[in-house]
């Protein structure tokens, strides 16, 4: 239901994109908080979110937790910032990126939908270019495949469905310890393929 409430809010709103995303994610947060109070089996439940909407050549991104959004073209660029204990350690200089990938606490997130009554959401605005691919994914992918390998796997496939399937298969081959969510968007597909 949390996903449906975000989609409904975005589709029906007349407000700015950022305000709409904020309201939609806060609404999903309230829903999860209520459900976790009503049902003891759901106590403490939470989730991460990465959401994007595109208008012309501008993408607006919202994230909470450690699900990520990347732009892939000639390189790979992570747009979102993980809300995790190890990301804080990296930012403070305590560990490097490789140590973060292998750290025992890499799955401890510092923000999640459902964790707090008032949720802090990060927003990003990105200009897109022809040839860009957008990847939204869970940590089930990024814990199993490094960024450069993600880029190489995407470049090795022609169609977008094969690209997504290849990423999931590679994550599973590398251990697939968590749920693996992959959403690929090719915003200028019609223009590029002409």
Model-based region annotation:
Residues 1-194:
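PP2C/PPM-type serine/threonine phosphatase catalytic domain
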């Amino acid at each position: 239901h949390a996903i449906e409430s975000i989609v409904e809010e975005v589709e029906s709103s007349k407000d700015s994109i950022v305000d709409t995303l904020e309201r939609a994610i806060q609404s999903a947060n309230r829903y999860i908080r209520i459900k976790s109070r009503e049902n003891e089996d759901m106590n403490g439940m939470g989730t991460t979110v990465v959401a994007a909407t595109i208008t012309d050549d501008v993408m607006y991104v919202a994230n909470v937790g450690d699900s990520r959004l990347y732009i892939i073209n000639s390189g790979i660029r992570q747009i979102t910032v993980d809300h995790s204990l190890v990301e804080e350690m990296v930012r403070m200089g305590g560990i490097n990126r490789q140590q973060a990938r292998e750290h025992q606490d890499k799955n401890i997130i510092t923000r999640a939908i459902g964790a707090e009554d008032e949720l802090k959401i990060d927003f990003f605005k990105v200009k897109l270019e022809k040839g860009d691919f957008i990847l939204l994914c869970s940590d089930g992918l990024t814990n199993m495949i490094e960024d450069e390998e993600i880029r190489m796997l995407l470049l090795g496939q022609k169609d977008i469905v094969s690209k997504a399937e290849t990423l999931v298969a590679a994550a599973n081959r590398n251990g697939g310890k968590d749920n693996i969510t992959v959403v690929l968007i090719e915003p200028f597909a019609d223009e590029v393929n002409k």
